[in-house]
Amino acid sequence: MKSSLIAFFLILTSAASGQVRKYANSFLNIGVDARAFAMGQAVVAQVSDVSAAYWNPAGLARITSDWDAALMHAEYFASIAQYDYASVATQLEGKGVLAVTFLRFGVDDIPNTSELIDENGNVDYNRIQLFSAADQALLISYARSSASVEGLSYGGSAKLVYRYIGDFADAYGFGFDLGLQYQRGRWAVGAIMRDATSTFTAWSVESGAFDEVFLQTGNELPQNNVEWSLPRLIMGGSGIWELDERYSLRTSLDAEFTFDGRRNTLVSSDFGNVDPRFGAELGYKGFAFFRMGVGNINRTLDLNGDRSYSWQPNLGIGFRYQGIQLDYALTDIGDRSAALYSNLFSLRYNWSRQ
């Protein structure tokens, strides 16, 4: 007990010397799976496939096949940035479900013009070199069903983060997500605590690579530092109805609670913020699905200083056949929010041992 208290206070002390940033490791908040995007990312209570490793690791326990795998590729900012996701989950023979997930958000082939001018003052384009700036994460997740409470499952994800900007700087970090799900009949509720212990990211700057350039241009030299992502709580509920022999309807409502200062969310204060999301899915014979969702509701300030609200509507379709599922989402229909619209595709395949 005494050693635990010492460790706890050491963590608090080191956290105080770092920087708490609202948007540290923001690439981890983009999301995965076109189905979830189409439903406004309101999936915390109902996710039950390999993407649960990201959305709510407790949902992994509801996977019924021996193996489940998924891939997604997306492009942002006129294809300048690439976002890739891959995940695989497997049953542990009655001892739970294990999943491994890889995420990468990066910009490649960036020209480095810091050495464009040679020592004689001449422009030499042969001195331009290309580099990449990327954020990567590896998630190792585990979940299992409760032996004492029917319908309850729990799980967690350990997150290993590696970020780099060419040879100029890189960072390592780690953190944990913890999740719960409870299902009873047609209803389900869920919750996930992202960055439950605060996600720690330590930056190391190779300052020698550009000290001279920074000093000549009057810029401040970057320093090594530590970033902390504070915990955020996402809670949600979901229900499903069989309309007839052919059609089913699922609806979901999630709310994300953040405690890192005032944000431009629907409900905001200095203490905390609430960001709601809603999604619906109409299914046809378990084969075809039409989805819609609303999220990213923000208070915006226009050029006249007047406040208004923006929101992001999403649509999508999906098809499932013999273990193969292909999903598509079009986000930000009609450019209702400040974000640009995106076309997202994801592929999922599940199979069992013979």
What does each of the following model-derived ranges do?
Residues 1-8:
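Sec-dependent signal peptide recognition
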Residues 9-17:
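Hydrophobic h-region of N-terminal signal peptides that target proteins for export
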Residues 19-354:
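Subset of outer-membrane beta-barrel
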